[in-house]
């Protein structure tokens, strides 16, 4: 059986189209979806019906699905979520709301597990360790190669003092996750961990591409093939600049553009900057209101988008 593993589409229908065309060309028979299907790009009402109708599909929800249920406010910090919620078709929202947080099943002699973040399997410290807000600082010489990232990812996992203990009590099988938008996989004995990367919003400091992973399970053998379909984001950026989303959430959408043109994280760094800016001008309103959010972004832009490390 050949599985196409897809995560973090984030409303990017053109990227999903590239992935599905490639998966079909390479004989994908089943589709495993690891969450975060909307918010960031505006085509989620095309993305969701496409995913729902894939053959032999299994899907879980991500962390951003819950943002579609935020009470609408006047702030700019969550404006992109409010806009997406206001435009989400009811049947698409109902499908998202029906998705479980995790799935576990046996198929073709193998146990499968899907959750949105690695922390569901190995603890929250693993989620924190692999957050994308450290990658842009770790790889100032980006774009990096997949081989380098795979090696670094494995070493980082193995370097954790309790990794062997956690692995020892984890049932054998294949563990699929997304969340940090970084394509990787690692096998430790009969434990295989796969992050297909982000289909629609890659942040792994490699070449910008529509990412997914092919997994073949046959006669007890597991074969992983990471797939990246490069494309130019600039035409999509120009198209989105004419969209309702750009008018409703210009700061957030400009952050999306920065991420796409560098294949690295900017959103978290900007939120750190906005917090410092708001404190400096004596604005204690949270979430950030439009005037402060916009002014903070304009200053951050003038300063060359400085990267503010996490605590």
Model-found features: residue ranges?
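Active-site environment of divalent metal-dependent phosphoester hydrolases
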Residues: 10-15, 39-42, 64-69, 120-122, ...
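Active-site neighborhood of phospho(di)ester-bond hydrolases with catalytic His/Asp-centered motifs
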Residues: 6-7, 31-36, 40, 58-63, ...
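Active-site neighborhood of divalent metal-dependent phosphoester bond hydrolases
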Residues: 47, 54-105, 109-114, 121, ...
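Beta-strand-turn-beta hairpins that frame and shape the catalytic cleft
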Residues: 1-4, 104-113, 188-193, 222-223
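A contiguous binding-surface segment within folded domains or other stable secondary-structure elements
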Residues: 147-219
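Acidic, His/Gly-rich catalytic cores of divalent-metal-dependent hydrolytic chemistry
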Residues: 187-196, 200-311
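N-terminal active-site segment of His-dependent metallophosphoesterases
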Residues: 1-57
């Amino acid at each position: 059986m050949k599985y196409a593993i897809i995560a973090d589409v984030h409303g990017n229908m053109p990227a999903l189209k590239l992935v599905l065309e490639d998966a079909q060309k390479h004989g994908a028979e089943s589709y495993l979806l690891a969450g975060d299907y909307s918010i960031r790009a505006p085509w989620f009402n095309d993305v969701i019906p496409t995913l729902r109708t894939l053959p032999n599909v299994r899907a879980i929800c991500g962390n951003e699905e819950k943002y579609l249920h935020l009470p609408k406010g006047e702030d700019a910090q969550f404006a992109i979520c409010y806009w997406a919620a206001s435009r989400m078709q009811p049947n698409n929202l109902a499908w998202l709301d029906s998705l479980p947080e995790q799935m576990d099943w046996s198929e073709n002699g193998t146990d499968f597990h899907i959750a949105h973040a690695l922390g569901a399997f190995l603890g929250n410290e693993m989620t924190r360790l692999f957050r994308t807000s450290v990658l842009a600082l770790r790889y100032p010489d980006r774009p990096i190669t997949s081989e380098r990232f795979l090696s670094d990812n494995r070493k980082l996992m193995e370097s954790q003092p309790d990794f062997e203990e956690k692995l020892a009590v984890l049932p054998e099988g294949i563990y699929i996750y997304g969340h940090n938008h970084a394509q990787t996989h690692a096998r430790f004995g009969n434990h295989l961990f796969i992050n297909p990367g982000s289909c629609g919003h890659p942040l792994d400091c490699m070449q910008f591409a529509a990412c997914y992973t092919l997994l073949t399970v046959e006669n007890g053998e597991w074969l992983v093939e990471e797939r990246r379909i490069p494309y130019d984001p600039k035409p999509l950026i120009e198209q989105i600049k004419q969209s309702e989303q750009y008018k409703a959430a210009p700061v957030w959408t400009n952050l999306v553009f920065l991420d796409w043109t560098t294949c690295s994280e900017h959103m978290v760094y900007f939120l750190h900057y906005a917090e410092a800016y708001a404190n400096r001008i004596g604005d204690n309103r949270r979430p950030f209101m439009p005037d402060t959010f916009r002014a903070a972004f304009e200053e951050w832009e003038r300063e060359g988008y400085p990267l503010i490390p996490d605590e």
